[in-house]
Amino acid sequence: MGNNFSVESPSLAPFLCGKRKYLYNLERNLEALHKVMQDLNAMRNDLLKRLSKEEEIGLQGLQEVKEWISMVEEIEPKANRLLDESVSEIQRLSRYGYCSLIPASTYRYSEKVLTTMEGVETLRSKGVFEAVVHRALPPLVIKMPPIQLTVSQAKLLDTAWARLMDINVGTLGIYGRGGVGKTTLLTKLRNKLLVDAFGLVIFVVVGFEEVESIQDEIGKRLGLQWRRETKERKAAEILAVLKEKRFVLLLDGIQRELDLEEIGVPFPSRDNGCKIVFTTQSLEACDESKWVDAKVEITCLSPEEAWDLFQETVGENTLRSHQDIPKLARVVASTCRGLPLALNLIGEAMSGKRTVREWRYTIHVLASSTAEFPDMEDGTLPILKSIYDNMSDEIIRLCFLYCALFPENLDIGKEDLVNYWICEGILAKEDREEAEIQGYEIICDLVRMRLLMESGNGNCVKMHGMVREMALWIASEHFVVVGGERIHQMLNVNDWRMIRRMSVTSTQIQNISDSPQCSELTTLVFRRNRHLKWISGAFFQWMTGLVVLDLSFNRELAELPEEVSSLVLLRFLNLSWTCIKGLPLGLKELKSLIHLDLDYTSNLQEVDVIASLLNLQVLRLFHSVSMDLKLMEDIQLLKSLKELSLTVRGSSVLQRLLSIQRLASSIRRLHLTETTIVDGGILSLNAIFSLCELDILGCNILEITIDWRCTIQREIIPQFQNIRTMTIHRCEYLRDLTWLLLAPCLGELSVSECPQMEEVISKDKAMAKLGNTSEQPFQNLTKLVLDGLPKLESIYWTPLPFPVLEYLVIRRCPELRRLPFNSESTIGNQVETIIEEQVIKIVEWEDEATKQRFSHFNNRDFVQMAEDPKMDGLTSESHPIQTIDLVGTTGSGETATANNIQGKKVVQSGTHATVVTMECQTYKVFTPDCPINNMIDTPGTNFLLCYT
């Protein structure tokens, strides 16, 4: 019957013949499937081990490797299921033979075996990777032991605190020689002030004593935002705010008496309860200041305390490694003469020296170095010089000296340093990623040696003044480093031919017409000269060997001369934070250029020359020219591009950008503004996995999504390992940010004006994606700002440790009933906490201790302008300001201070607001009886909106 059926049904014959080929080879295919699955699993496990090992040294898995592992995890259960069913299917096949009575399910099974085997084989062929990782950004903070005070230092802290709290003391001066611990004491005082809820605490590193720099730091703390205001205007605005506040101003490192009135700081008095504390190396700075009420001197440690500190730094294991080492160690410690800085530096340098020969050699080097400084009384520079001489790696020495180009005790971006070193050719690695790894490792080494100090939430480093003094002494023959507001014109150098590197920072120079004959100059750092407007072409005429040119933060600089095209060896050009309007056409001649930074150049209109810079590896346009399809085509010509920062406006551009894998995978910073997100308002970040900073403004995003598949295996590195900063402003439909669970290194999160935001991390979504995971978010978060989120109910569903949190702001979140804090949160940290009084009243605290800890600092002590700082200077036509908030001013007729918004259009975006009318240089606050919108629309009137 079966034979008759097959003969009499010719239309089915091809079907049966086609299917039987699966049956004939079923057993062979099953054996092959079993073998290739074993091979595939072995390859997958090897990759996981390699990834895990590389993760330990700070590297990150390549996206293509993650996707391959994810596909293996998808196909593995299908193959295993087929193999589990193989016995019953083979038995069924044996029972029926290869006849037409075989069930259709067996045919389907045989077909699945073959197609699955082919899929597994394809995966196996694609599973060979020469590299499985690329560089992840370094840890936010290099773990260093906390500073422990000696007995005398602890007593000194108590003394300083008692004097500061004396009602008759308004200003306290702390003085002592460099390296003795003045900054440490000032930091300890700051921490005690924060714990004791004194009020507004402002910490300023004075640097070059530039009045406007001090004003800017104070203004930043007060929420004031300036661009081109005069020094006098800034002083008036600072004074208007501070005279209504109880504040403590901490000034670290002044060298002469400061004019408080010029800065805008009111004098402390018994009536206002304000305090000022400053540190200085000069007793005269204390004695000459008519406003100093008390002084505290810091002296060097006693011999026994110095020995205790030295032992602690060197470590017991080293001291016990040979019986003669403790005696030799006392000789080394004695050369430091009780100076904590020197003890820490030389102690760290000797912590790995475990032979008598090494210790004796160090004593010899110290003696030799002392002979180089016969006029030095304290012996500090000889110690520092001996540490430098003891560096075994010449590359580390060069990198260390490079750091001296920047002002003392001021932040230097780690990323900036690494980029300088790469472009200078200091780093030995030819591959850029390997060079970046080497650069960050060198920074880590210098921090561990205590020659650099971490700052800026771990993203920056700075150099102690005495360490920098030694570095400049070593490099003095080839370095020129100047700065400060006393400098009004370019300096004269006896022999420009000797100069290799020059730094001119924070001066009053306005125009440059000089033509220095400096053909050997390779590095010119000309930053933060706030009044610089014009540079002549002759200035660059003789700089034929220039490799690095940094003109960043010269905010008045509007153009570059065409003569810059003669810098044919230039590899690094930084024009960020300038008001430059266009790039010289001659820039296209700079064929050696590999790094071009145009971040925050909001006046820049076009960048057509980019298409000619074919060797570019780094291109930065964050908060600059918006990407369009023409610019995208130009960027695609840059085949060597490794890093890209962009501003994107428009859905078509965004879609096209994310579809080009080479460009998308190189994006480090993305500013997405006023863009309609297609696909139902869902923004997928899968393609931009190297993202470091994401800034979203005014987009219709409903949800931000990522590919969660790569997180099922615990061994896989989180997908967004690099992202450090996230800013979201005015995204009307966004409800949560659960994807941040995959951003373990997130350092700063700011979310404002998102009316539909209900949760920061959604418990339901997290459980659905990750299951009952024990991973806790925000382990590296230093700054959290939540403002204007009327529906926000939850940040996270359980208390979190927040181990490095430093700054917390929660305002205008009326539905927020619980905060993810308990008495163990932020333990060991001093957190500047600004929580609106209304929020404090409605929050259900874990316990009274938690409430006291996080609720002591409210809006009466703080002024915060909520205008997006990235919009500063933009015209109302291009970006109407949605809200500007002034906290702490209520009631009819009060005078308030705020940012100058002359000529800017302000529109209402909320429902409960107070209107502030501009009147000369003050603002009158009142509650209107008529609808706010009617008043906002009044022609010729400027308003501030103040939420109450």
Swiss-Prot record:
SMART domains: AAA. ATP binds at G176, R177, G178, G179, V180, G181, K182, T183. It holds the Pfam family AIG1. Gene3D superfamilies: Helical domain of apoptotic protease-activating factors (1.10.8.430), P-loop containing nucleotide triphosphate hydrolases (3.40.50.300), Ribonuclease Inhibitor (3.80.10.10), Winged helix-like DNA-binding domain superfamily/Winged helix DNA-binding domain (1.10.10.10). Keywords: ATP-binding, Coiled coil, Leucine-rich repeat, Nucleotide-binding, Plant defense, Repeat. InterPro entries: AAA+_ATPase, Apaf_helical, G_AIG1, LRR_dom_sf, LRR_R13L4/SHOC2-like, NB-ARC, P-loop_NTPase, Plant_NBS-LRR. SUPFAM superfamilies: L domain-like, P-loop containing nucleoside triphosphate hydrolases. LRR repeats lie at residues 498-519, 520-542, 545-567, 569-591, 592-614, 615-636, 640-661, 666-686, 690-711. GO terms for biological process: defense response to other organism. It comes from the Eukaryota. Residues 20-57 form a coiled coil. GO terms for molecular function: ADP binding; ATP binding; ATP hydrolysis activity; GTP binding. Residues 134-432 form the NB-ARC domain. Belongs to the disease resistance NB-LRR family. Potential disease resistance protein. The LRR repeats probably act as specificity determinant of pathogen recognition. This is Probable disease resistance protein At5g47260. It comes from Arabidopsis thaliana. The lineage of its organism: Eukaryota, Viridiplantae, Streptophyta, Embryophyta, Tracheophyta.
